[in-house]
Amino acid sequence: VLHELSSRSRFFFSLTEKDNLVIDAHCHSSSILVRTDAARAFRLMADGERQGRWALGSWRRRQVADTTFVGESVFSGLPTWVRLHVDPARLAVDYDVAATESGLRFRNAARVLDGSALGHPPGTALVTLFTWRLADQSDDAWAQICSTHETEMFLIRALLESGRDGGEGDEDRTPS
């Protein structure tokens, strides 16, 4: 049964079964299974410049400091700043995001899992993006980030599976 969460969240519905909330109104996740190893998938997710190939909110990134990058939103044309906190041991990345460098704060996270750990064939990886809704985020802005992350999953998979991710054997780092 679908139920509207609140007037503030009128575009987002919760799926309930026996009065248990199934869809989280505060966090959105998008995942996709890719035919590449987890290490390669993680390298793409953890490389701030190469993310400019798939991150629609921060396209065509350039590095401005050790872990800080700036790109351009395909939606507004305005700059989007991103700072990465990379944890290679856990194949995890936290992303601070803002319109200005001084405004950077935690917004998104990525995890990469070896597909075989979840029963998928060897040589596969599960890539997941998470985002959390800000207290003052409009319905439109929330809908945009959620649907954007879902679209980005297909870009990530296409880049990794085609070898156009900027990894080994793909020296062209220019986003197309």
Predicted regions and their residues:
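Glycine-rich portal/gate segments that line the openings of hydrophobic small-molecule binding cavities
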Residues: 50-107, 120, 151, 162-163
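Generic structural detector for well-ordered beta-strands
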Residues: 31-35, 83-85, 111
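Hydrophobic ligand-binding cavity/cleft-lining segments
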Residues: 9-65
